[in-house]
Amino acid sequence: MSYPMNRRAYAETYGPTVGDRVRLADTNLIIEVERDYTTYGDEVKFGGGKVIRDGMGQSPITNKDGAVDLVITNALILDWWGIVKADVGIKEGRIERIGKAGNPYIQDNVDIIIGPGTEVLAGEGMILTAGGIDTHIHFICPQQIETAIASGITTMIGGGTGPATGTNATTCTPGPWNLYRMLQAADAFPMNLGFLGKGNASQPEALVEQVVAGAMGLKLHEDWGTTPAAIDTCLSVADDYDIQVAIHTDTLNEAGYVENTIAAFKNRVIHTYHTEGAGGGHAPDIIKVCGQPNVLPSSTNPTRPYTLNTLDEHLDMLMVCHHLSPSIPEDVAFAESRIRRETIAAEDILHDLGAFSMISSDSQAMGRVGEVILRCWQTAHKMKEQRGPLPEDSDRQDNYRAKRYIAKYTINPAITHGIAEYVGSVEPGKLADLCLWRPALFGVKPEIVLKGGMIAWSQMGDANASIPTPQPIHMRPMFGSYGGAIAATSLTFLSKAALKKDIAKKLNLQKPAVAVGGIRNLSKRDMKLNDALPQMEVDPETYQVRADGQLLTCEPATILPMAQRYFLF
């Protein structure tokens, strides 16, 4: 016997289905459900008088015989590959399947088995995404990690040793001893972590030493001297050891211009940090490298998106981060050369075109570690407001734009750094690093952050209350953030050479150590939905930016969504 439900009643009970639309936070972005893996009339839901009970939606099957450890029911998945409604089964910390959950003895088409050993997370009316990946971390203080995971980031890649002067300016963990100590410190945090060694050297020996000691990649930074010789040496070592190189190029053009740097790449793949240039790089035209097929370009979030306040705040930030003095004219000139309204405005549009592939933070070194996700979606909102729907979208929904922008902080950073086998998307086989969001708070404050299939952080009310919801409600660490659960649900990323040398055992690391790989044959074409290769031109006098001959310019935003109304308390 069928029971008809109108769309509103159905969505309020089981979440949106095919054809339903959802607004992302208070932005102008609308996503529409493309497919529903669940079965109408046979959905599973937990609660009093609901379906997931013994003999109904819950089978007697043991976990050993196939029941999952955790099921997320009726979630709306937003990922680069699609926007779908589904149940998600998690087993032994990894995504087992995306599909239809239930009891196969009494329900049809069940591919996620619920048993007595299965925990339930209600995903009805919630958006499920992969945990974010921030690939531009200055490890200045450990509190960054708490702030990052509370915002929905589950993987952090970068360098540093704490608030040392070198770390404040550059994302490098230099030398074996420093790498060892940071790898040991990583065991304390419910976060996947990987460290970049210092890549600035004209001879390879010291670089190889760091890679073998555990660096998952190398970082070239102008404050250490990013000369063509250093670039060539670093990339040669990377080719030998299958690791990624990140680069912050020569703002002052002392050792050469952007053309010299591109020539030094010799068509080898490289990750260019803050490719617009305000964070550093050849002035005024480092932005041109986003048109190179071997360059994987990212932004950092202080310039995301271009607003009335962007230029004003940058000068002071830059002076502090790069150990400059406002009383030295040359230092002031150096700082001012990096901050250009024309290239920052163009950066907005290049993201919307898919020519810039990633967004990261530049944590405490001009960027805000807890705002990677937020500023990505603010950029998407601003671009829709100023440029209208993308050609692939319509007046009804913004699915393609949403997929393009979520790829910038999930799958593309994972591919770039050789870790997409483990993280970066909501796909079977990957670590269950997932975020559940209320649509009204999407991109701003996650409801629950899962690390390796266990709740690590969550919105939580007063611990002395009779129920979980009395205020003050804010993000707090949960059981996945304590004791041995940390090592059981997180990863440490190393080079293949370090793994072969058994560095993890030598240092008695508790987290599983896994090797990065598949990096040196990458190109811009591997960047999901963000692989555009425009012909770039920058006027050296006016700083005007053109892509394929078209002037890229836009007005600064005067007001943004996902901002003060969400942070009154």
Curated annotation (Swiss-Prot):
Q: List residues binding Ni(2+) 2.
A: K219, H248, H274
Q: Which family does it belong to?
A: Belongs to the metallo-dependent hydrolases superfamily. Urease alpha subunit family.
Cofactor(s) the protein needs = Ni cation
Q: How does it assemble?
A: Heterotrimer of UreA (gamma), UreB (beta) and UreC (alpha) subunits. Three heterotrimers associate to form the active enzyme.
For this record, an example GO cellular component is: cytoplasm
Which NCBIfam families did the record assign? Answer: PRK13206.1, PRK13207.1, urease_alph
State the Pfam families in the record: Amidohydro_1, Urease_alpha
What positions does the entry give for substrate binding? Answer: H221
> Where is the Urease domain positioned along the sequence?
131-569
Q: Which HAMAP family match?
A: Urease_alpha
Q: Which CDD domains match?
A: Urease_alpha
**Source lineage:** Bacteria, Bacillati, Cyanobacteriota, Cyanophyceae, Gomontiellales
Its name, as the record gives it, is Urease subunit alpha
Tell me, in one coarse class, where this protein mainly resides: cytoplasm
